[in-house]
Design a protein with these regions (language model features):
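Helix-biased detector of long, well-ordered alpha-helical tracts
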Residues: 1-329
Length: 329
């Protein structure tokens, strides 16, 4: 569902569940964050989220693993640890049992890698395969991360390359080179766990993960909630091998146009940035990285921590005073 349609569907819920009536709901509908957070004691809050989607790769094991990693990313974007998961499955009746088992095995092994446990789930018959997770994570109620809170001067860190969406679309069309698709798959299989743990050692004012609403959509949500403008340097943005090549061939998924229609009025591009590169920034990602707004005094510290622990990162821009918009220079 596109961002505008989603907002229209969810809007009535805010009138039923007013934030002032639920003081222990620390993060809920009002901010549209990556997950909900509910305080259960002075020392503990639970993070609750769910995500599932149709296959982005042909291999059933990798599909299950990627879907699980993508779902768990919301817990990491909130600064938490994965604890408990339930499978969400929609499978065709004629799908062989061994393929279903491989999908579930892929998801299960990634949840185990994250330190969590799968305790059950729900299945239904569906013409098109769907798989994902409902998740519970833990976080201290005073130490969670959120989209809101970015401040002018913050340094923007990104922990994964962009371009998964266009590469997987090219693969579905049979035109992606094998090494390009393999690079996208390997990135999608990477947990955001290490980056999330390291970012908590410095002053991070706002965090989100880059998934279906693309770099521009998710960063715009952060900018608007925080009351700042996020300025990105186009030459600092990292792209997977092949992404710009397929962009030049205009092999964009339909979701890119939906995102552009929803967000382009809030984005300013410098002249000279090619149309296809602009469109890449509206293109949905799967199992993307974290976008972290770091206090400028702590940017060098986080960069050093990431480097020491083998965590890839790119410093891609800064937060500035502004009306809640995006600038691409």
């Amino acid at each position: 569902m596109g961002p505008e349609a989603l907002a229209q569907v969810v809007r009535p819920l805010a009138e039923i569940f007013r934030p002032e009536d639920y003081p222990d709901l620390l993060v809920g509908l009002e901010t549209g964050d990556d997950a909900a957070i509910y305080r259960v004691s002075e020392e503990l809050a639970i993070i609750f989220t769910t995500d599932f989607f149709t296959p982005v790769v042909d291999d059933p094991y990798e599909y299950g693993a990627i879907s699980a990693v993508n779902a768990m990313s919301d817990v990491y974007a909130m600064g938490g640890d994965v604890v408990l998961a339930l499978n969400i499955c929609g499978f065709p009746r004629d799908m062989p049992p061994e393929i279903k088992a491989e999908i579930l095995r892929g998801g299960a092994e990634k949840v185990a890698d994250a330190g969590g446990v799968i305790a059950g789930g729900h299945t239904l018959d569906d013409d098109e395969p769907k798989y994902g997770l409902a998740l519970i994570g833990f976080v201290h109620p005073d130490e969670f991360a959120a989209k809101v809170g970015a401040r002018p001067g913050d340094v923007l860190f990104l922990t994964k390359r962009l371009g998964v969406g266009i590469i997987t679309t090219a693969a579905k069309g049979g035109v992606a080179e094998e090494n390009h698709m393999r690079g996208a798959v390997e990135q999608m299989l990477l947990l955001n766990r290490r980056a999330a743990r390291l970012m908590k050692r410095v002053r991070c004012h706002a965090v989100t993960d880059i998934t279906g609403f693309a770099l521009i959509g998710h960063s715009l949500e952060m900018a608007q909630l925080s009351g700042v403008t996020l300025r990105f340097q186009i030459d600092r943005l990292p792209f997977l091998d092949g992404a710009r090549e397929y962009a030049e061939e205009w092999l964009f998924p339909a979701g890119a146009s939906c995102n552009k229609d929803a967000y382009e009025s809030h984005v300013t591009f410098s002249s000279g940035i090619p149309d296809e590169v602009q469109m890449l920034l509206f293109t949905p990602e799967t199992s993307g990285g974290l976008l972290i707004c770091v206090d400028p005094k702590d940017a060098d510290t986080l960069a050093a921590l990431f480097s020491e622990q083998g965590q890839e990162y790119w410093i891609v821009g800064e937060a500035i005073e502004g009306p809640g918009a995006i600038e691409i220079l």
